[in-house]
Amino acid sequence: RRVHREAVVLARDADAAGLAEMKFGAGKGQPGTVIMITLGTGIGTAIFHGGKLLPNTEFGHLDMNGKDAEHRASDAVRQLEDLSWKKYAKRLNRYLFAMEKLFWPDLFIVGGGISKQSDKYIPLLGIETPVVTAQFLNEAGIVGAALAARKEK
């Protein structure tokens, strides 16, 4: 859109984070299907196939035992319920397993605020698809938003 002759770019936070990680970070050069998962107050997702974003996915709303996944496996829930890393990893593993069976991805990239502590839960995951930490951690969305805006100019 244009406002006062300037372009305005809208991007979901997880999509923006995924753009950054695919261009400069953990997903750079990765073939196949890559899923960016942002874990914070909710769960955000960005899905890339062949390096192209499939925009506006909302798989934080995937059902997990009668609740949205983000009400079971987000970082906010981990903190609210004071879950141990082992219990949190078990919940996150269930979510990633469901995503794995839906998409058969080649890579999961985990970002968001909790990514700074990924060494405490990623080693506890037991899915087939590799899971790596976002290179830009919680700043990936900022970098990706700048990329999206730059692309529009």
PLM features: residue spans?
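ATP-binding/phosphotransfer module of carbohydrate and carboxylate kinases, centering on a glycine-rich
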Residues: 2-6, 20-39, 47-153
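General beta-strand structural signal in soluble alpha/beta enzymes
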Residues: 8-13
